[in-house]
Amino acid sequence: MYQFNFILSPLDQFEIRDLFSLNANVLGNIHLSITNIGLYLSIGLLLTLGYHLLAANNKIIPNNWSISQEAIYATVHSIVINQLNPTKGQLYFPFIYALFIFILVNNLIGMVPYSFASTSHFILTFSMSFTIVLGATFLGLQRHGLKFFSLFVPSGCPLGLLPLLVLIEFISYLSRNVSLGLRLAANILSGHMLLSILSGFTYNIMTSGILFFFLGLIPLAFIIAFSGLELAIAFIQAQVFVVLTCSYIKDGLDLH
């Protein structure tokens, strides 16, 4: 007999659940589990590979998959070139492109009804932001040594204000770890919660009677329009994330 678990709270859709678990008595008691976030990240990886396989054709007339992939490639390439430069940017372009595709695909998967929005989880976005900022910091230290800390010293500031301004710059630099991941997760989380609340509200109205069914078409139209906005946000947030990533890498390379 099947058991259906209805979503009673807008936050239930973001709960991480075990889909399959196994206790293995190998090297001690090892608990292996597959969660919904792991499953959807794997689905995102498979979709990304499938998309690039469909786009990889050598025909004179490209198909729609190739055109869309070339558009994404050109967009990310222009971001890298503008934020870094044509020479240094080529070295970091594969990482930035993979990061953009990863975020975009998982944002779009979250738009599918009854799916799981992986990028709405702070544990995932904070892991990415901490890794990126830490990598940019190591890059700056490797390239400039102790001169890297001049990044926290504003040029032309009075000597009396120097300790305070250095402290402010240092706190601002540390906050990148939080702000980069927080921006992505908060936008995806808030949008999905609002859609969930509006959908439940519209469903209750339209199932209350014939008259209310037609009245419910008004919020239903708003939900459709807001879904289009969420689709645009999925692209925008992926772009913002890689733009800021390029900016942090540039700070490590050029100290400004």
Swiss-Prot record:
Cellular localization per UniProt: Mitochondrion inner membrane
Main localization, broad class: mitochondrion
Annotated Pfam families: ATP-synt_A (PF00119)
Example of a GO biological process term: proton motive force-driven ATP synthesis
Propeptide: 1-8
MF annotations from Gene Ontology: proton-transporting ATP synthase activity, rotational mechanism
Keywords: ATP synthesis, CF(0), Hydrogen ion transport, Ion transport, Membrane, Mitochondrion, Mitochondrion inner membrane, Transmembrane, Transmembrane helix, Transport
Spans traversing the lipid bilayer: 34-54, 92-112, 121-141, 148-168, 186-206, 209-229, 230-250
Membrane topology: Multi-pass membrane protein
UniProt similarity note: Belongs to the ATPase A chain family.
Quaternary structure note: F-type ATPases have 2 components, CF(1) - the catalytic core - and CF(0) - the membrane proton channel. CF(1) has five subunits: alpha(3), beta(3), gamma(1), delta(1), epsilon(1). CF(0) has three main subunits: a, b and c.
Task of the protein: Mitochondrial membrane ATP synthase (F(1)F(0) ATP synthase or Complex V) produces ATP from ADP in the presence of a proton gradient across the membrane which is generated by electron transport complexes of the respiratory chain. F-type ATPases consist of two structural domains, F(1) - containing the extramembraneous catalytic core and F(0) - containing the membrane proton channel, linked together by a central stalk and a peripheral stalk. During catalysis, ATP synthesis in the catalytic domain of F(1) is coupled via a rotary mechanism of the central stalk subunits to proton translocation.
Protein name according to UniProt: ATP synthase subunit a
Species of origin: Emericella nidulans (Aspergillus nidulans)
Highest classification ranks of the organism: Eukaryota, Fungi, Dikarya, Ascomycota, Pezizomycotina
